[in-house]
């Protein structure tokens, strides 16, 4: 990818550990910044790119773990940390929920970070967009048996918000879960700019590792937001139930 002079690279969720680790998450968790972040930041500096990747992070209190998305920049510095807000299943026993949705202004565009199951909640993408995001990066470990959800959510969030979605989804297997791959870049009208959907094993049909590169034009975001008015025509005064605690 670096040979094609890319500006932004996105990796899947929890790339330094795997997904089904239970108590072993505590062993593999690192502080941020720490050895893994520093190593990837060095690579970002070496190739002059932004890198977003998922890992297990921990606070000074050793028992407090987060499922995190880390962004490092071309200057080799830590840019942002996002801790996954929407945890599902056994994640809830391993991780603490995050509580902030950071938006990062960069010279390549304004970027928001999401992780996996966050994608199922339209409020996350909309909140990031209302705070200025033009590109939403999603680090994911989406299961193969639910891959239609992944594809639908990625396109839906792009349509709803007239933004670019950059989603990296894991392939392979953990203890009981098979992951669905199909990483993709989706444009503000739901058009798929690039996808790894066809990167499959010829015998089993299972998704394979790979990477895809797309060139995007942020003028499309401004054009379609002006044309379709998804943001301007909102009526937030009638959406009170969205923020009511049930």
Where are the regions that the model predicts?
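Cys-nucleophile CN-hydrolase/nitrilase-fold catalytic domain and related Cys-dependent amidase chemistry
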Residues: 1-75, 81, 143-163
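A short, polar/charged loop-to-alpha-helix boundary motif
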Residues: 84-97, 199-227
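Short helix-loop capping/hinge motifs at secondary-structure junctions, enriched
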Residues: 77-80, 191-193, 221-222
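Active-site catalytic loop in hydrolytic enzyme cores
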Residues: 32, 42, 60-134, 139-152, ...
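CN hydrolase (nitrilase-like) catalytic-core segments centered on the catalytic cysteine
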Residues: 32-52, 110, 120-213
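Short beta->alpha transition motifs characteristic of CBS
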Residues: 17, 70, 82-88, 184, ...
